[in-house]
């Protein structure tokens, strides 16, 4: 009797535990009576039709639908799954839609995910706390995630940037060719996703067509256990909107752990797509009057909104700006050039502002530009700043990034410069995912920047002190020629005048020791250029706190290598083909320019001759006075002493554009 009672208790425990396990396979022919689904955000079920809606015609929405029970695989089971669903995407305006995804994730928490092209499961940083595999039906074109078109299907792993994608289509076995499908048509589309081993296949077809014999997408390198870091997963759908909107519907859904046991959807039981009928209905007279009244009210609102908007975005033009007319751009032209400062044109964030790519008309062709939006808290100093910007526009040298003009609007200044397609030099020095620049190219860039600095110091109408020379401020044009940019910290003064400024500005590691006492001069630019020479040759930043003390400071480390008669070992280890004599000469020149004593540094005219081989380096040694000695600016907690320092701990400062930092006195 006791034995029977124990067996009964064990059986009851087994039944209770089993009730908490996933129920697979499952099928929903519609969503009229739904169990085991969890909806959040804008997702809802339309009771009248039994249809699942992810988003509607409201901007910046996110909708999720999960099968509420996790799918679990025993250690003896292979991780595989098959799913089949019918969806419909309906435009809600022009432009319309961002599409939707079917996803597999290790959690139902998508905290930090963003709307628009990130589908409510990813974000613009390319990181998410939730590990996820997704199949996207994408109806927008976003260049920052490398979309191939505004009508494609992609496979995403932990990022909105697809590992493989293709334009939406299906293989017709009858016609023996691919036939295009328009995702954002409002017509029902069948989607099959099959995963087994490391292969993921995705197939599409119009409603009532058989599953194609050839998949649209096939990836053979997906390890779902590694992606999810476990054998437990949630499955579901996500959709999102931005300023572009669409209706995203799921009509039916089936899921199984294997293709063989995947249930079919009964197409006859599927709900109809809302708003899909094109049949025109007659309009009653009363309704016509009502619509006319609504139109009149809407028109009045639009007129008021237009007048308000025109006043809100009116430009600031003062009498003293008339002399700068030819280089002043209208706000309207820059707004159109950047597509309304759209995130799709966003290039990055530089000193004190965001930068956007723009396209401006120029005679019979288009000109690509970079437009930086800089905030300015007041009118104090604006006149002087604009005057200096205009003066710098007159600088003409092949190795300078041209400043084209400006626009002023309320408390905002917009600076327009030439667009540099290959970005900033620091990306190629410190981002090891990019191809390393060969030595001959690096040397050519060093000569370009030396020539530009020599021009600023000795050949321009006024002496120009750059004050922020570093790899992040060196841009690369289409031919990878070096161009010196970011004149936001620069100052001009007449020859023979006192060049001292009211505040020490620059980037820690590049700042000469005399900056705090004597102010900026051409000599402080030479010091920074010396550090830049070492930076480019060694492929390292001037100060790297994460390294051992012996290697932490670049100047000191290069000097120590020279003392050990192994100066060539200081070079970037990624350099393969190079002249040892050239590399050692550039390293010695870098130490000479970064001499602690200002009077011992060469002028930029001499530096150009040294680099071009027209002049031999003077004799000096690693133990010579001032050689390899660190500036106190690199050793002390400078930000507490000097109010206007900028730190460059990553290469995100400048990317594919010139970043004009704005500084007036000790303010921003």
Curated annotation (Swiss-Prot):
EC number: 2.7.11.1
A Pfam family the protein falls into: PK_Tyr_Ser-Thr
Summary of the knockout phenotype: Increased susceptibility to the oomycetes Phytophthora brassicae and Phytophthora capsici.
GO annotation terms (biological process): defense response to oomycetes
TM region positions: 286-306
Keywords carried by this UniProt record: ATP-binding, Cell membrane, Glycoprotein, Kinase, Lectin, Membrane, Nucleotide-binding, Plant defense, Receptor, Serine/threonine-protein kinase, Signal, Transferase, Transmembrane, Transmembrane helix
Catalysed reactions, semicolon-separated: L-seryl-[protein] + ATP = O-phospho-L-seryl-[protein] + ADP + H(+); L-threonyl-[protein] + ATP = O-phospho-L-threonyl-[protein] + ADP + H(+)
Active site: 468
Family assignment from sequence similarity: In the C-terminal section; belongs to the protein kinase superfamily. Ser/Thr protein kinase family. In the N-terminal section; belongs to the leguminous lectin family.
The protein, known as: L-type lectin-domain containing receptor kinase I.7
Organism annotation: Arabidopsis thaliana (Mouse-ear cress)
């Amino acid at each position: 009797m006791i034995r029977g009672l124990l067996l009964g208790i064990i059986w009851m425990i087994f039944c209770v535990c089993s009730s908490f396990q996933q129920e697979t396979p499952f099928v929903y022919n519609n969503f009229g009576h739904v169990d085991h689904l969890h909806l959040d955000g804008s997702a809802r079920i339309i009771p009248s039709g039994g249809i699942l809606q992810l988003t509607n015609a409201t901007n910046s929405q996110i909708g999720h639908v999960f099968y509420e029970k996790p799918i679990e695989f025993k250690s003896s089971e292979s991780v595989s799954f098959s799913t089949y669903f019918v969806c419909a995407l309906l435009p809600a305006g022009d432009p319309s839609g961002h599409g939707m995804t079917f996803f597999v994730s290790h959690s139902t928490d998508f905290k930090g995910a963003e709307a628009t092209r990130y589908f409510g499961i990813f974000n613009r940083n390319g990181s998410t706390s939730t590990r996820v595999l997704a199949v996207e039906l994408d109806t927008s074109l976003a260049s920052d995630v490398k979309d191939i078109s505004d009508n494609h299907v992609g496979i995403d792993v932990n990022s909105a940037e697809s590992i493989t994608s293709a334009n939406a289509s299906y293989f017709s076995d009858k016609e023996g060719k691919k036939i295009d499908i328009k995702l954002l048509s409002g017509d029902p589309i069948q989607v099959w996703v099959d995963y087994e081993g490391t292969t993921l296949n995705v197939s599409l077809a119009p409603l009532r067509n058989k599953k194609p014999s050839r998949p649209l997408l096939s990836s053979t390198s997906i390890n779902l256990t590694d992606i999810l870091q476990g054998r437990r997963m949630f499955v579901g759908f996500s959709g999102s909107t931005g300023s572009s909107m669409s209706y995203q519907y799921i009509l039916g859904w089936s899921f199984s752990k294997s293709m063989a046991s995947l249930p079919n959807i009964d197409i006859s039981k599927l709900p109809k797509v809302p708003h899909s009928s094109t049949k025109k209905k007659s309009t009653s007279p009363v309704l016509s009057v009502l619509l006319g009244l609504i139109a009149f009210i809407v028109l009045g609102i639009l007129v008021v909104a237009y007048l308000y908007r025109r006043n809100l975005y009116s430009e600031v033009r003062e009498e003293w700006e008339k002399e700068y007319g030819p280089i002043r751009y209208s706000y309207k032209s820059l707004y159109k050039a950047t597509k309304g400062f759209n995130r799709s044109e966003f290039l990055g964030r530089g000193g004190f502002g965001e930068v956007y790519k723009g396209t401006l008309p120029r005679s019979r062709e288009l000109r690509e530009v970079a437009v930086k939006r800089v905030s300015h808290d007041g009118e104090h100093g604006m006149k002087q700043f604009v005057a200096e910007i205009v003066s710098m526009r007159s600088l003409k040298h092949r190795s300078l990034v041209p400043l084209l003009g400006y626009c002023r609007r309320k408390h905002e200044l917009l600076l327009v410069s030439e667009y540099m397609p290959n970005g900033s030099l620091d990306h190629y020095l410190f981002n090891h995912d990019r191809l390393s620049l060969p030595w001959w190219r690096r040397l050519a860039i060093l000569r370009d920047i030396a020539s530009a600095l020599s021009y600023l110091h000795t050949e321009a109408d006024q002496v120009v002190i750059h004050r922020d020379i570093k790899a992040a401020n060196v841009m690369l044009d289409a031919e990878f020629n070096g161009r010196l940019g970011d004149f936001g910290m620069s100052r001009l003064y007449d020859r023979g005048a006192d060049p001292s400024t009211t505040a020490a500005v620059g980037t820690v590691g590049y700042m000469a020791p005399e900056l705090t006492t004597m102010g900026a001069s051409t000599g402080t630019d030479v010091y920074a250029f010396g550090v830049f020479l070492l930076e480019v040759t060694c492929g390292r930043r001037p100060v790297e706190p994460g390294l051992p003390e012996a290697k932490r400071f670049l100047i000191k480390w290069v000097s120590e290598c020279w003392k050990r008669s192994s100066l060539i070992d200081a070079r970037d280890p990624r350099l393969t083909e190079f002249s040892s004599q050239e590399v050692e000469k550039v390293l010695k020149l870098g130490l000479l320019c970064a001499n602690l004593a200002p009077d011992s540094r060469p002028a930029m005219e001499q530096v150009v001759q040294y680099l071009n081989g027209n002049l031999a380096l003077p004799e000096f040694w690693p133990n010579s006075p001032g050689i390899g000695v660190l500036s106190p600016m690199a050793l002390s907690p400078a930000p507490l002493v000097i109010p206007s320092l900028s730190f460059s701990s990553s290469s995100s400062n400048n990317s594919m554009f010139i970043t004009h930092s704005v500084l007036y006195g000790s303010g921003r």
